[in-house]
Structure formats: structure tokens, C-alpha cells
């Protein structure tokens, strides 16, 4: 039986974001603020404006459209601006009451309305300034060969016909819309990572995926700010600016599976082609006294592997069992019913206990199980909580760019654990790194940056603050968006709103 030599050569530690890099990064942002179509998720309609996709101002409530009694707006100005898009939709919603169409149906219907508007009136608003809708990649052949996707198309086609009635387009034409929108649309999130809507932006759709992205998408409602995560990258340049289509904090096997299931390509980015990415799926050495990771992956041919550090042989059966166990673990934990929610903590503990026996502590599955358990229960059984957070942080550094907000959030978990142990000097550099990351990700005027700046200042200046006061600064409750509008105004890039008249009242 062949024996694989396990090479475990650690990469040289990348420095975190330096202050002299930040101004360089800010100078090369790219802003998109004319989407082709947007839609708030149905469960979020009462929380976010149907026009700007922002939440209401503090102390304010959304105003409901008096025509359809469904769409809601943060102001009369937003409702008036949206009328050009909402007018044809409004009467359909009223006619379909009390049957509410799926979010996807409402979204694709808006895409159809936009296409028809452009055909009739031309592109007066610059919606197709970045590229034409007709130029979008559609993967029609792949979608036709995908039985599950085609079954979904038939379902959506039927529901769209019921919603649009006599205004429904021919099936082949709708298939073209369905394919282009499926491949090129993106989700809209708050800064806390909560999904609130979906959008098709022709400019954003130009950017390719990388599991080692060089830019992040930051949202201000439907507006997108593309911010470089590394110095030297210009967000305008699609040859060097890459975004992530998926959650990149996972193994190569899971990333490629998800990318292929929706976008129909096998990712060969620099990270997916890097053998060291297998550190994310490392297993334990057979020698209990050895802490070296044994590199493998879920899909690698099982074989005996020799530990590079202690030379112990990890048997093929052990390797295969670990690979199979990783494949059985859920990619995410999203319980749907009260019984599942109640059972989740126990299930997570059981899965984690087995994972820790066979998988290395640096394994991404272990990190995700620990993170899920921490979020569900607020506690972990490990004696040294800061050590656990440091392990997850080291794992995140293998998954995310050094200026990614996920890394910043994990740094704050370390800061919190150290503060609670009264190790404030040790917490201070982690707070500083988190502050620099949030400056890159969110900007100088965002609450996340300002809050972390205050935390670092208190620690660095040794200002007398209670543990409770410092810990409070590690918890983010403000979900305010990045103020991209102010950036546009400063750059004189904000266009006037389209002409709107004859809007119905708001309640």
C-alpha cells in the first residue's frame, strides 16, 4: 500500500491591514447605484423600503402603498421615485390579493417590465450603461440539462402566468429572462449579514468569482460599493477585481459543489488550485501526543498518510472514515420548526464531539461547528474560550482575505474573551487590527468602525472602564448601512431621481 507523505509547511504569516494601505484602498472603490431590478424578500417587506431597500429611520415606520396595500416605503419621496417601477406591479398585486406571489416571481416580473420599458422608451436612466441585458451569460444548455432547475422553471413559469395574466410573455422569452436572472442576480444584505432582498445589477454582474476575493460588496440598500480588500487592486478593473459568489469560509469540495450547482463551473481560482487549502480539511495524527495536522480532502483517494512531524502512519481506513464524516456534516444549520430549534444545541454538541476526535482543531468543519454552537448557546465547553476563538480566527485567516469583515468580527470575539479574563493588554492589538479592518470594509463614519475605535482607544490609553462597558463595545446592535449616497454626493455622481407623477397615496 502506498504511503502519502504529509507535507505541513506553514505559510509565512500575512500582516493585517496596515494604516498606509487604507487610503490606497479607499481611492479605488467602485459604486453601483442603478440596478436593473430589485425586490425585497416577502418576509422582510414590513422591515425594508421597497424602493431603496433600507430600513426606516430610527423611530420611524414604513408607509404602506395605498394601491396594492403590500409594498412599503420609508418616505413619500421613495414611494414617488418607485412609481415608475411599481405602477404596473401595483395593479397586479391588487388583482392577485389575497394570494401573494413568491419573491422570485415579483423579482422576475420586474425584470420583464424593465426590458419592455427599455424597448419602448430607450435607456434614459442609464440602466444599461455598464452592459446590455442581452449580453448576459445565460447557461441555457446547462439549465436545460438540470432536471431540478427545469422543474423549478416550470413552477415559476406557471406562477408568473397567473400573476401577469394577459401581460405574460411567451415561454421561450421567459426562459431567457429566467436563465439570465438566475445566473447574474445577487442577494442584498445588511452589514450584519442578514439577507433582505435580491437584485440584478448589470455592472456588478461583470465581476467574476474567486474563493480568494480581492474586493467585497458592501450594501447601502440596493446600492453596492465594491471595496478592494487588498492594496494594489482597482475595483474598476474586472481583470484584477474578484468577488465571492458564495460563503468562502468552507472547504474546496463544498465551495466547488455550490458554485457548480448554480453557476455551472468548476472553480480553478488561485485558492482552489493551492494544495495548502487542504489544511482546512486536515485530520488528527494517529499519535495522540502529536498535534500536527494530516492534510487530506473529502474527495482525495484514501491512503495511508505519514505524519511529517512524528512519522506515524495514519491508516487508510482512518483517513476514509474522516473523509466520509466531513461529507455527512451539514453545510449550514438553519432549523425550520420549533422542534428542530430545541434539538439543535444537543445535535451540535454530538457532531462536535465526534469531529474533535478525528478532525484536526484547524479543520474548517470543527471551526464551523464551534461557531454554530457558540451562536446557539452563547457558551462553549472549552476551558479556554479565548484559545477557542483564536483557533477559529486562525481558521478564518486561511479562508478570508485579511481585510474581510468576518476576520474583524472574529477578532472582536477574542477581544471580548480576553477582556472578561482581565487581560486588557493582550486584547488591545486584536482590537486595533479589527478597527483597521472595519475602516477598510465600512468606512470612517460607520458605527462598526467608530465603536471599535472607541474600544481600542480605551484599551490603548488604559482609560478606566468597567468590564461590562468594554464588552458592550464588542457587541454590534446598530445595523445602519454604509452611507453610499454621501459618497456619491461628494464625488458628484448622484443622478437626479427619474420623473414620477400620479403616484397613489401612502398609508
Curated annotation (Swiss-Prot):
It comes from the Eukaryota. Zn(2+) 2 binds at residues 65, 68, 86, 90. Disruption phenotype: RNAi-mediated knockdown causes lifespan extension. Keywords: Metal-binding, Transferase, Zinc, Zinc-finger. The keyword Zinc applies. GO terms for molecular function: histone H3K36 methyltransferase activity; zinc ion binding. Changing residue 245 to F: Decreased dimethylation of 'Lys-36' of histone H3. The keyword Transferase applies. Its EC number is 2.1.1.357. One of its GO terms (cellular component) is endoplasmic reticulum. Zn(2+) 1 binds at residues 49, 52, 74, 78. Changing residue 247 to A: Decreased dimethylation of 'Lys-36' of histone H3. InterPro entries: H3K4_H4K5_MeTrfase, SET_dom_sf, TPR-like_helical_dom_sf, Znf_MYND. Expressed in pharyngeal and body wall muscles. PANTHER family: HISTONE-LYSINE N-METHYLTRANSFERASE SET-18, HISTONE-LYSINE N-METHYLTRANSFERASE SMYD. Belongs to the class V-like SAM-binding methyltransferase superfamily. Histone-lysine methyltransferase family. Histone methyltransferase. Specifically methylates 'Lys-36' of histone H3, inducing di-methylation. Plays a role in modulating lifespan and oxidative stress resistance, in a manner dependent upon daf-16/Forkhead box protein O and the Insulin/IGF-1-like signaling (IIS) mediated pathway. Represses transcription of daf-16 isoform a, perhaps by methylating histone H3 at the daf-16 promoter, which in turn leads to recruitment of histone deacetylases and thus modulation of expression. This is Histone-lysine N-methyltransferase set-18.
